[in-house]
Amino acid sequence: MTPETRPPTSAAVLFDADKLVLELRHDAEGAYHAFPDDGPGAPGAPRVALSLEEALHARIRPAGTAEAVLRAWAEGAAPRGAVALADPSAAPPVRVRAGAVVIRNGAVLLIRFTEEDGASHYEIPGGGVEEGETPETAVVRELDEETGLAGTVGPEIARVWKDGRHEHYFLVAATGEVGPPETLDTYGGVPVWVPVEELPATPLWPRRLSWRIEHWHRTGWPERPAELADSITELGPPCGW
């Protein structure tokens, strides 16, 4: 491999005033944004400038680099110049997970886990995709096992890379009522309904998805799945990026 053909290891973080400059590219799923680089990736790709609010809801690749840049920018210290490329999609996932976003009467169904000290955290119902399954079939099975609800899969709203996992999240229309605890496979968790408006302040994994679900519920669901890396390790601090 020569320097001319070696994949780039860094990208340029460029700003035009207070807007992030990105390249607009396309793949089979449609448009996405990428950090400019000096490699052969997309010669002549047009550039666009996004505000922070626009960038938070854009599909920016690679997702790991986007997470680092958006976090720093949202916290008031946007990086500039060369940054390392971090692409979690480049390696095979250690596990593929499917999660069901079920909303009923203004509340979202979550699994609550209570620690020994009384503190709680929450997860979106779902689990691993088994051999022979698709994420769509797995999410229906997992919803039934963890809550007793029957589900009809709607659009995929987010893809999250976390701790080596590739997680798919779907809007799911569910019927029935949550089953008795002794019939559910939740690994010690309890299904609960949480008002959607409380999600930004709820200690929910994945953290970067919590406030987005509340935002999308108010403003409309994304036409294509959001692509997010999530390296957050603590649920206490607020996350708006």
What is each residue range found by the language model?
Residues 40-79, 87, 129-152, 160-208, ...:
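Unchanged
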Residues 67-86, 210-241:
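Charged phosphate-binding loop/patch that engages nucleotide di/tri-phosphates or the phosphate backbone
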Residues 16, 20-45, 103-145:
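Conserved Nudix-box catalytic region and its N-terminal flanking loop in Nudix hydrolases
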Residues 1-30, 64, 203-221, 240:
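Hydrophobic, helix-prone linear segments
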Residues 1-11, 73-99:
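Acidic, metal-coordinating catalytic segment for phosphate/diphosphate chemistry
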